[in-house]
């Protein structure tokens, strides 16, 4: 994770130079989060040989329920549902804490 953050930070610095604009802290933070998550998803999907969603739902029902309860207000406010694939990412972050 540290290496990815450093690489993304460097890339954002280079991008700022290319476009001739200094990004605000808010923009930089949003880009860090978005790009790091994007890279992780691309790496994980490249290595995935099967869809683990159903297995995950069966094996981690309690965790799925916890996520649904914890993020209910966010989901309701934005009118979205956190997909199982994203819950797997959240689970992996929590598990590797």
Ranges and model annotations:
Residues 1-97:
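A cross-family "folded-core" feature that marks the main globular domain of proteins
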């Amino acid at each position: 994770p540290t290496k990815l953050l450093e690489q993304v930070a460097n890339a954002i610095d280079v991008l700022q130079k290319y476009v001739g604009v200094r990004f605000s802290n808010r923009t930089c933070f949003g880009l860090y989060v978005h790009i790091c998550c994007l890279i992780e998803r691309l790496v994980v999907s490249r290595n995935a040989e099967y869809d683990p969603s159903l297995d995950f739902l069966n094996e981690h029902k309690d965790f799925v329920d916890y996520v649904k309860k914890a993020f209910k207000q966010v989901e309701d406010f934005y009118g979205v549902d956190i997909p199982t694939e994203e819950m797997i990412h959240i689970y992996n972050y929590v598990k590797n804490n």
